[in-house]
């Protein structure tokens, strides 16, 4: 027996296989954007699978964090580990082996790779203008662009095409830039995270920006986050996880394909991600499943931080028993928590990274003091 979560390509796998399947889904009691349970029920009903679900509230989420930190072995600050562990525990009651869709986005260009391809096409277009014209705001005004689009166009116009990817994926390394690291942990050496990604770009065999991005995602995000958390969460529940999209033959085939097989232009300014997979599924699944916007595996952690959880974050990070406070700037951590409460930028992600690191130090009784 197998587990498949409710994305359209996995629903297609059930459709093509036998009907003795269990499907499992996890959601949050906040509902709305953070719960895909109605969609998961629709998929299960369509394919005739046995459906199971689990709902997590804020207290269960917080109470599960130490288990997640312990199961991860290392400080892996991805909050989707919590619902993944809950899902794995639910599935283990009925199955021993699970199938997961990790890798499909990284080899077939899911996520926002349509936006990346579109923006790169715009950059090529803008490069056709003389540089002096690109730097004149009046030229953009005559084109009818908004002030925001003018600023973006000017930025794009002044980035060499060969360096395009450097402005596209800074989040793949860390939510802390070098300056923020130095403020948080002053008077210490810091690993330059951007250099790691720059080296992976330089090592990419293709000179095409989309192919380069996919290569970097396959080497970093896929290996160091997605597969890590899938492996840790399922092992913690005594499950065996398999990833059919990462069969070496599938990966090699996908990496040989042209861009338009993965990201297809479907209008003047619209692109379709994972196009080849959608074509395969459209004869087998309803359009509302195939064309539903991708959400990934969202967690309401940042939403909760803006709605009362900031007090718990302060207690966790700033108490006298805290280990991070031994070396990290308490002022900077306090500032990040306040920014997270206000929903500013990616400050919520930074706070959760600090919380996971603090919990990891506590669970494994590690001190940052030498």
Give a label for each model feature.
Residues 2-86, 90-93, 97:
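Cysteine-dependent PTP/DSP-like catalytic domain, specifically the C-terminal lobe
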Residues 4, 8, 13, 126, ...:
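Extreme N-terminus nucleophile/cap motif
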Residues 16, 46, 105, 114-117, ...:
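Phosphate/oxyanion-binding loops and surfaces in catalytic or ligand/nucleic-acid-binding neighborhoods
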Residues 25-27, 55, 102, 237-238, ...:
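Active-site proximal loops enriched in glycine and acidic residues that flank catalytic Cys/His/Asp
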Residues 35-37, 65-66, 109-114, 304:
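Short aromatic-enriched loop/helix-cap "lid" or pocket-rim segments at secondary-structure transitions
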Residues 49, 80, 93, 97-99, ...:
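Adenosyl-5′-phosphate
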Residues 52, 74-77, 119-127, 260-267:
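Short, polar/flexible loop-turn hinges at active-site or ligand-entry regions and domain interfaces
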Residues 85-148, 227-250:
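Active-site adenylate/phosphate-handling loop in enzymes that bind or generate adenylated species
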């Amino acid at each position: 027996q197998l587990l498949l979560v409710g994305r359209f390509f996995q629903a297609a796998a059930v459709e093509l296989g036998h009907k003795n399947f269990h499907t499992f889904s996890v959601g949050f009691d906040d509902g709305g954007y953070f719960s895909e349970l109605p969609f998961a029920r629709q998929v299960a009903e369509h394919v005739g699978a046995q459906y199971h679900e689990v709902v997590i509230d804020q207290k269960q989420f917080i109470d599960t964090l130490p288990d997640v930190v312990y199961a991860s072995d290392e400080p892996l600050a991805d909050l989707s580990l919590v619902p993944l562990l809950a899902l794995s525990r639910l599935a283990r009651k009925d199955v021993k082996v699970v199938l997961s869709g990790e890798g499909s986005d990284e080899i077939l260009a899911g996520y926002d790779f349509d936006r990346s391809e579109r923006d790169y096409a715009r950059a090529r277009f803008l490069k056709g203008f003389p540089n002096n014209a690109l730097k004149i705001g009046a030229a953009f005004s005559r084109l009818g662009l908004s002030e925001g689009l003018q600023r973006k166009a000017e930025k794009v116009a002044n980035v060499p095409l060969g360096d395009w990817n450097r402005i596209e994926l800074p989040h793949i390394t860390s939510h802390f830039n070098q300056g923020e690291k130095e403020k948080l942990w002053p008077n210490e050496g810091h690993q330059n995270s951007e250099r790691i990604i720059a080296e992976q770009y330089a090592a990419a065999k293709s000179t095409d920006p989309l192919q380069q991005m996919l290569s970097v995602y396959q080497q970093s995000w896929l290996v160091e986050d997605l597969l890590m958390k899938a492996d840790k969460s399922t092992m913690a529940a005594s499950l065996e996880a398999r990833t059919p999209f990462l069969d070496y033959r599938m990966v090699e085939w996908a990496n040989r394909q042209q861009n338009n097989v993965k990201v297809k232009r479907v209008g003047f300014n619209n692109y379709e991600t994972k196009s080849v997979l959608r074509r395969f599924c459209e004869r087998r699944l309803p359009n509302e499943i195939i064309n539903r916007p991708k959400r990934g595996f969202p967690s309401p952690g940042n939403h909760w931080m803006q709605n009362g959880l900031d007090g718990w974050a302060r207690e966790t990070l700033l108490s006298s028993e805290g280990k991070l406070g031994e070396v990290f700037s308490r002022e900077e951590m306090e500032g990040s928590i306040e920014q997270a409460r206000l929903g500013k930028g990616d400050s919520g992600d930074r706070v959760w990274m600090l919380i996971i690191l603090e919990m990891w130090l506590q669970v494994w009784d590690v001190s940052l003091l030498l």
